[in-house]
Regions:
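Small beta-barrel nucleic-acid-binding modules, primarily SNase/OB-fold domains
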Residues: 2-8, 14-153
């Protein structure tokens, strides 16, 4: 490893400490989990609110609840590793979390049950474009973006 890479690693590693490695995870909604007392909001994505609904072929369904359940299924008592990225305005820890080295944020966006939160990050835009092009998840429905839903409700 070059001296520069080594020094950068030493300098920046403390900024992104491993937040958690645990199987004791409570899923709050499609983009928020709880590990112990720590509320963790997935950074860079926005999932539908828990009470939010979508319409598919004139049938209304709970897409917010579906997003949450998809995350529950994905985690299924597996070890979750989270990397801290900061705090949000509500005091929640912002982090990217992984199961088997797969980003849960990327998974949710690629499945169409979360959106790239472009206001804060462009990291998951390609995942969103993939889901949209394949009409996955909410992209096959009539929906409001979560940020519009929150503003209107």
């Amino acid at each position: 490893m070059s001296l520069i890479k080594f020094l950068l690693t030493i300098v920046f590693l403390p900024l992104f400490p491993l937040l958690a490695e645990t199987t004791n995870v409570i899923v709050t909604d499609g983009d928020t989990i709880r590990i112990g007392e720590e509320r963790i909001r997935f950074s860079g994505i926005d999932a539908p609110e828990i009470n939010q609904t979508c319409t598919y072929q004139e049938l209304e369904f709970a897409c917010g609840e579906f997003s949450k359940n998809l995350l529950v299924e994905k985690i299924q008592n597996q070890q979750v590793n989270c990397v801290r990225e900061g705090k949000d305005q509500y005091g929640r820890t912002l982090a990217e979390c992984f199961v088997n080295q797969e980003s849960l944020s990327s998974f949710l966006v690629r499945e169409g049950y979360a959106f790239a939160y472009r206001k804060y990050s462009k990291k998951f835009v390609l995942d969103e474009e993939y889901a949209q092009n394949k009409s996955k998840g909410m992209w096959a429905t009539e929906f409001q973006y979560p940020w519009d839903y929150r503003r209107n409700n």
